[in-house]
Regions:
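Short, charged surface segments at domain edges that flank catalytic/cofactor-binding sites
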Residues: 1-21, 46-49, 88, 95-96, ...
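Short connector loops at helix/strand junctions that flank enzyme active sites
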Residues: 17-19, 34, 50-54, 72
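Secreted/periplasmic proteins that engage bacterial cell-wall peptidoglycan
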Residues: 21-35
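Short Cys/His-centered divalent metal-binding micro-motifs
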Residues: 27-30, 43, 54-79
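Histidine-centered catalytic micro-motifs used for acid/base chemistry in nuclease
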Residues: 35-39, 57-58
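Short clusters of hydrophobic/aromatic residues that line enzyme substrate/ligand-binding pockets
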Residues: 36, 70, 96
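Short Fe-S-cluster ligation motifs
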Residues: 56-60, 82-109
Length: 109
């Protein structure tokens, strides 16, 4: 595992927790090609960066799909818990909204 990327075990734990779907829109994703989004961004490094509570499975990349939407609309993303403040070391305490399920979740590790 690099400083900014979770190991394969964590990646699969998050993918399975999210039922192989984009956490936001619900699109089914391939276990061989999916993206994880860091709720507290990688540029705000800390020891919990790659914990499951800081990660959600998303469709697209930084330039398309829900992953792009998160970064293009930060105000909405903070409100919906898709982004977490750089000063928050406990993303597990910040509810995250799933649009296709129409509800909030608290993610654990």
């Amino acid at each position: 595992m690099s400083k900014t990327n979770p190991d394969i075990e964590t990646r699969m734990k998050v993918f399975n927790r999210d039922h192989g779907r984009c956490f936001i829109c619900g699109r089914f994703l391939s276990a061989y090609a999916f993206n994880l989004h860091h709720r507290r961004m990688r540029s705000h490094a800390w020891e919990g960066l790659n914990l499951p509570s800081n990660l959600i499975t998303v469709c697209g990349s930084g330039t398309m799909g829900c992953h792009a939407r998160i970064h293009a609309h930060p105000k909405e993303s903070y409100v919906k818990g898709w982004l977490v403040s750089a000063y928050n070391d406990h993303p597990e305490d910040v509810p995250v909204f799933s649009e296709y399920r129409n509800r909030e979740f608290l993610l654990n590790n």
